[in-house]
Structure formats: C-alpha cells, structure tokens
C-alpha cells in the first residue's frame, strides 16, 4: 500500500469517517483543506435512485446556477442571418456556419459550449466525431439546439451547467469555486437538486436523491446532510 503524503495525512485527520456534514460546515472544511496554488472548482456528485440502463431513467438536463460556476465560458454558435447578430450581441465568442465547421475540423476546439440553431444542424451534423467525444455536440435536450440562440448564449455565460447520469446513476458537475461564499455554494447546489427533482423520471421508485457529495478538484469528498439543504 502506498504511503500517504503529508497533505493526505492532514486531510484524513480532519475528516470524520461516516459523517454527513452540514452544508456550510462542509464548504468551510473544503476551503480549509485546499492548499493548492490555483482556485479549485467545487464539485458535487448526486447519487440518484434510477437505473441508467433503462432509457426512460437516464436523467439529463441543464440549469442556470444562481451564482454561476466562477468559470469563464467560451461559446461558439452555429447560425446565420439576424440570429448570428443576436448571438454576438449576447456575448458569443465565435459565430459562423461552414467556416466555423472547417475551423473545428482543423482542430480549433477551444470552446466550452457549442450552440446551434435548428437550420444549422445540417452543418453541425458533420461534426459528430469531432464534437461528440468532447461532450460539445449541440442537443435540444439541454437547450443547445434552439431557435433562440441569444438566450442560450446568455445562459451559458451566466453559469449554466449541463449534466447526465453516468453508468452508476450519478451526476457530476461544478457548482462554483473554493473562494465562493458558503451560502452562494449552497444556493447553487439547491438549484441543481431542485432541477433534478423537476425532471425525476416517472418510473423511478423509492428514494430519488440518495446521496449528495461535495468535493474540490484535488480534495476529498464530503457527504452532505440533506436536511441542511432547503430543497
């Protein structure tokens, strides 16, 4: 068994095994334990009572967090005409059609979100092998294929997160940065869970939100006492 580093020992000494933490307490502890030289993301993992092997129990959506994620989001939009002007006015970093597709095929993929209007899907459809593996393929289920590209750009820039259950029925997403106030982090997590409950599959039985775990990029995961969340 590999020996624990000094940092790992220090972390282990401050975490109570088996404890479900009050959210504000957990946020404060994660901040205390963050010793890296960059601003770590604060991430949440939510274990859901679903069977992702069943297509009607795959949970997938997008929601705008009230306080954003603290990240600068680069957005590319496939559209044309007045919609292109609206997308640029909304803050899109790049707008185009065939020219943008050619750039992406050439390896220019420095974007966090790709949005498309329905009429642009004839162009975007050629990029499945380029965008798909990176999770960038526009999809109407998460609002990235829409005639209202300007609103989609604004949502992306405002801190919209997209999520989907993995093979174990868990969703993972960022909910802020270590420097965020604990109350803002809490409100972001509450907004996420409210959205998860809104789209609960009708066929899901028993406990739906089974476990909520908060962590940082390089830190430990702390189980959250759901009673400390207002949702």
UniProtKB/Swiss-Prot annotation:
<keyword id="KW-0687">Ribonucleoprotein</keyword>
<dbReference type="InterPro" id="IPR028364">
    <property type="entry name" value="Ribosomal_uL1/biogenesis"/>
</dbReference>
<protein>
    <recommendedName>
        <fullName>Large ribosomal subunit protein uL1</fullName>
    </recommendedName>
</protein>
<dbReference type="GO" id="GO:0006417">
    <property type="term" value="P:regulation of translation"/>
</dbReference>
<comment type="function">
    <text>Binds directly to 23S rRNA. The L1 stalk is quite mobile in the ribosome, and is involved in E site tRNA release.</text>
</comment>
<dbReference type="GO" id="GO:0022625">
    <property type="term" value="C:cytosolic large ribosomal subunit"/>
</dbReference>
<keyword id="KW-0820">tRNA-binding</keyword>
<keyword id="KW-0678">Repressor</keyword>
<dbReference type="InterPro" id="IPR005878">
    <property type="entry name" value="Ribosom_uL1_bac-type"/>
</dbReference>
<dbReference type="Pfam" id="PF00687">
    <property type="entry name" value="Ribosomal_L1"/>
</dbReference>
<dbReference type="GO" id="GO:0000049">
    <property type="term" value="F:tRNA binding"/>
</dbReference>
<comment type="function">
    <text>Protein L1 is also a translational repressor protein, it controls the translation of the L11 operon by binding to its mRNA.</text>
</comment>
<dbReference type="InterPro" id="IPR023673">
    <property type="entry name" value="Ribosomal_uL1_CS"/>
</dbReference>
<dbReference type="GO" id="GO:0019843">
    <property type="term" value="F:rRNA binding"/>
</dbReference>
<comment type="similarity">
    <text>Belongs to the universal ribosomal protein uL1 family.</text>
</comment>
<keyword id="KW-0699">rRNA-binding</keyword>
<dbReference type="GO" id="GO:0003735">
    <property type="term" value="F:structural constituent of ribosome"/>
</dbReference>
<keyword id="KW-0694">RNA-binding</keyword>
<comment type="subunit">
    <text>Part of the 50S ribosomal subunit.</text>
</comment>
<keyword id="KW-0689">Ribosomal protein</keyword>
<dbReference type="InterPro" id="IPR002143">
    <property type="entry name" value="Ribosomal_uL1"/>
</dbReference>
<dbReference type="InterPro" id="IPR016095">
    <property type="entry name" value="Ribosomal_uL1_3-a/b-sand"/>
</dbReference>
<dbReference type="InterPro" id="IPR023674">
    <property type="entry name" value="Ribosomal_uL1-like"/>
</dbReference>
<keyword id="KW-0810">Translation regulation</keyword>
<dbReference type="GO" id="GO:0006412">
    <property type="term" value="P:translation"/>
</dbReference>
